Amino acid sequence: MLRTSVRSPLLYRCLSKRFQSTAVPLSSKAVQNDLELTPKQQTNSSTTTSTNIPPQLPVNVEALYYAPLKNPVTHGHLVADLQLRAYDNENLDFFCDFILRAGYYLGLPMTGPKPLPTRRERWTVIRSPFVHAKSKENFERHTHKRLIRVWDSNPEVVQMLVDYITKNSIAGVGLKCTTYQRTTVDAKSGKISDAIEEINSTHNINPSLKENEEIGAKVVELLNTPTFKKYLEEK
């Protein structure tokens, strides 16, 4: 026979109901009467987390996550060539992306960036002029290039783009801009015929000196001087 001494009325009540044949579970009212429970309350911090939705980004800021937009080329008239050079690919590609985005908002039709051949330079020098004079050391430098072309644009707008990217340039990236301008030629005034005659006269100075026109023109100029004519007449 099991002998137990129950001193607490709550424990006695629980044990008595536990060993009953029906085994009815305790109700919530009985538990609340016997035990003082403090239910948890939901704070404001947990409810406000779902309302912290980030605001929608502007279109121009969201466009930074995509490739730069480009205006279509309509007439195919080349206006300018932008050639960029750098020793690092990352800064070069970043600045090309910046130029394309700036040109798009200015309304310039642009193509590129087109990768140009990389220039490789190597040097071999001695490590030291005294102790390590017999050992050599090699140095190598790579110059990366990109080409961006501007089409069908006003020269003033192109100059505005060049000024803007020059003002916001990146250290270590060189920029070379070549512009092309077109002017009207009046055939009635005779400018075309004068230009053709001038070109033909430079070629007909001496047929044997066509490969180097500047040297041939200089030789003819020296032969026509009075000092050379004096010696030629004596002979």
UniProtKB/Swiss-Prot annotation:
Family per record: Belongs to the universal ribosomal protein uS10 family.
Pfam family, any one: Ribosomal_S10
Protein name from the UniProt record: Small ribosomal subunit protein uS10m
Subcellular location: Mitochondrion
Targeting signal (transit peptide) range: 1-19
Subunit structure: Part of the mitochondrial small ribosomal subunit.
Keyword Cell membrane among UniProt keywords: no
Classification via SMART domains: Ribosomal_S10 (SM01403)
GO cellular component, one term: mitochondrion
Keywords: Mitochondrion, Ribonucleoprotein, Ribosomal protein, Transit peptide
SUPFAM superfamilies named in the record: Ribosomal protein S10 (SSF54999)
InterPro entries: Ribosomal_uS10, Ribosomal_uS10_dom, Ribosomal_uS10_dom_sf
Keyword Ribosomal protein found: yes
Function: Involved in mitochondrial genome encoded proteins translation. Involved in the binding of tRNA to the ribosomes.
Molecular-function annotations in GO: structural constituent of ribosome
Location, primary (coarse class): mitochondrion
UniProt-listed Gene3D superfamilies: Ribosomal protein S10 domain
One of the GO biological process terms: translation
